[in-house]
């Protein structure tokens, strides 16, 4: 199309090659504003007129040919659009592979048109030469080597998208400033393999089409020295790599300057500008194939002088056309380097190719009045812009689902067939395949892009060059031009690959007038906004053709568009906008966006489902957005999500739906609605199928894959949250067929594999722990143990030996008791069939999986959950609790629990200590713990002079309290254990705590330690040893004002101090000597009082308020011996960290919901705050681990539980069982 100039023959006015000095930038070339006729006579004037008339005819011919060629392209685009509409998804997914490059061959008729264009160019060349030879035209103003400027933007950009080309036939003055540079193909930063690896490149020739050859990628060129003539500015000339002046091949680089800078530095042609972003740049070459690449160069912290960011291209877009035989080349132009403009006052126009006007309406009006004359707008007469949303025939955008590590593609927006005012978008947005849901399970990028910022691909359109966008590293102002001018498009190559944080950077920057801008105004100074109009671009108001950012109401309105691709793109853009921005999330809710997104869940197109779910997941992420969660529920969002989950087979959509449900489940108000609407579907459609429970004979590899399923992980996370919603929620989940079996199967199949530490296993364990909470009180099997059984246990145990000698009554009762006992050996009584369903929650067979987790798992949350489950199961006087305690001893679980006391994790130590306390309710367990675990328990107490104080000081008050309570239970009615506590140095530490007067420890800890000391003083036989060690009665009892009235009655009187933090209830005396029958009678008479107190405690506990001291003492007197932990909900941020007492209906300690990435990025990093933003495990509040020992005047679960179920004062463990396996290991 263009004749190549021989090496070294560039005219004086041609743009210098890189090796030329920067002063050559003054010699930029353009057509003179007017023809110089002052030195010629009349004949010269007539000759000039004839030449100009000839040129005008050529322009008209060019316009006609261009129209014909554009018509051909529109026909091809229409055919492609019809093919695309016939597919189900309306996308070009077959073309989304990053390993392929497609070449759209031109029609046969286009060859003829291009030949005519070439012929026309030669005629224009001859006219210009005639003007120069006659002396009319200064050779420095125009050279034949630069005749490509005669082309209209339509002629030069024929390989833009058929769906809406920017380029249209124009006049001789063509909105293009062209400069010629000489270079060799070897010096171009060719993009061969990398181009294929990072984005699609469609090769379209503007003239005689040649196949695109992707040769081997040359080594990245070193950063060249600063060359101002080639650095980009508002009117950005292209910059070239270093090349010898006598290069064998020529490459034409020309730029379309939206806002050329005014003349500066005394030169009317060169205007260096610093800190300006490059605009769309094109490179062309003689009749060779052309390939486009558009690296992205933006940063959320760029200097304010850069132009306002656009809807899709908030950074400069550099489009380079390479010669044949070369790989597609990318030249990344950082927006902050200095540059020079090669422009002409007449021919440098604002063509806005690939970008759009960034001036606000006011500024553009002033700008137009100052800069434009009446001849500037003839170009726009035929170049009308098409509204992107219309997506009419030949210009409807395709929606291609592409890999997350690829860059979004440029979308053409104009069509000569559709005269619609421009509105908001210039590219179709595409969400990424958001499959990385946690830092530990994120999908890493390919090696070429690991650790770099990479946006997800925007949809490609038929026959359109894919233009990947990339960020450059201009973060904090202008960078050195030498280091930034020639960045390779490779993300890791070159010293200029200086990128900002790839995770939280904004990809798109709205315009100045958009209230949703994430970076604020970014207009350059007024002085830099001047541009020179051409003769044909002065008539019309340029504001008609300026592109702007979409306003939020417009994007929300597009959710109702008639084309699914527009709806999908709008939803994906909303997902991007609201990422990490709670204000935008609230605004979307106020403008009705949530309702429209919920409506899209029932759409027929899969892509719409995907984008809508992604937007909803971001909208309902975070504690600050509970209003959005409730709004989604009020819009019918939960049933809509459930319907979509039930009918879709797309794995990504199932992940998104379950992710939205997980986010919703962290809101307390939505837990029961989720259980009502989604529990059955989550269980039957996700958990059971993905667990593999129904087909247990599956291969082992499938089991491992199931555990890594994000859908299963999300579903179990959702149920983990809702399982803490209260008694009704637990009851429904226990009764849900297959749920308990599937959760246990997930755990059992993970044992011995690397998946034992996975989040899915953690969620399953925590669900089972919650469902194990208050089993005896909330299940029908537990409630069968009513008053008759209580009476039998009371009579048989209370009278002790007297019952044996009193005749048939006592013997019968003892016989019944012995039949109900199981000491860990032989078959279980009352258990003829294998357990199933809810029975598996309390059956002793569940002990072994829990103990295996405790011995093999390294996930502290899983360890805490398993220990808490055993703690819940071993609580109380229910016969299954007795069996659980025996089973733990049989399975050698006590050493496992004691070993966990030594790990450096406060929450795990707290859970294990409490579990040991419940295990010590069994007499044999108590003996073993006192013999083998006393030193470990004492070691965990703060204080003393040993070298382990540092670790103890780091323990929370809850953990210290739990250890004290365990010690108290171990020494109760066991003098040998009390002596072992003294021998282990426990007295010194306990006295140090009790005498701290609250300076170092909370009152709760002080009181718990005082209770242990008081219990030790009750053993009169040990007092001499205490005095021998230097201790007196003052050290044991003086600091505990609450036990004054019990100080005179030692254990020899067979009485446990009634205000002991552990022995606070009738049930709490299970391991003490039998009480008198009169006490047993009084216990039964107080039953109604217990129930009333329980209701009162429940009320105050639910309110999270302190009860009165009277209520607290009553609750203590009615408590049970077992220390029950509250339900272990999934961590949730919404619980109050200053809450002093846990609730009967517990909540989660920290939020486990998540928000996805920005929809157009994929990174090895995964989440922002929680699950889909950053899976950060927030430390549970102290309230969740408050030991409910009557140490605070608050209603708590122990009070509530004991009031609801006033069990026997004595436990099964009172007697010894000779056949029990009592060995420690």
Curated annotation (Swiss-Prot):
Q: What is this protein called?
A: Catenin delta-2
Species per Swiss-Prot/TrEMBL record: Homo sapiens (Human)
* Regions annotated as coiled coil: 49-84
| Quaternary organization | Binds to E-cadherin at a juxtamembrane site within the cytoplasmic domain. Interacts with PDZD2. Interacts with ZBTB33. Binds to PSEN1. Interacts with ARHGEF28. Interacts (via the extreme C-terminus) with FRMPD2 (via the PDZ 2 domain). Interacts with CDK5. Interacts with CTNNB1. Interacts with GSK3A and GSK3B. Interacts with DNM2. Interacts with CCDC85B.
For this UniProt record, the keywords arranged alphabetically read as follows: Autism, Autism spectrum disorder, Cell adhesion, Cell junction, Cell projection, Coiled coil, Developmental protein, Disease variant, Glycoprotein, Methylation, Nucleus, Phosphoprotein, Repeat, Transcription, Transcription regulation, Wnt signaling pathway
Q: For this protein, what is any one GO molecular function term?
A: cadherin binding
The impact of changing residue 34 to S is: Found in autism; likely pathogenic; hypomorphic variant affecting dendritic spines development and maintenance; results in reduced interaction with CTNNB1
Q: What's the effect of swapping residue 482 to T?
A: Has no effect on Wnt signaling
Q: Which gene encodes it?
A: CTNND2
Residue numbers bearing the Phosphoserine modification: 267, 276, 327, 360, 415, 461, 514, 1065, 1076
Q: What is the effect of changing residue 465 to N?
A: Has no effect on Wnt signaling
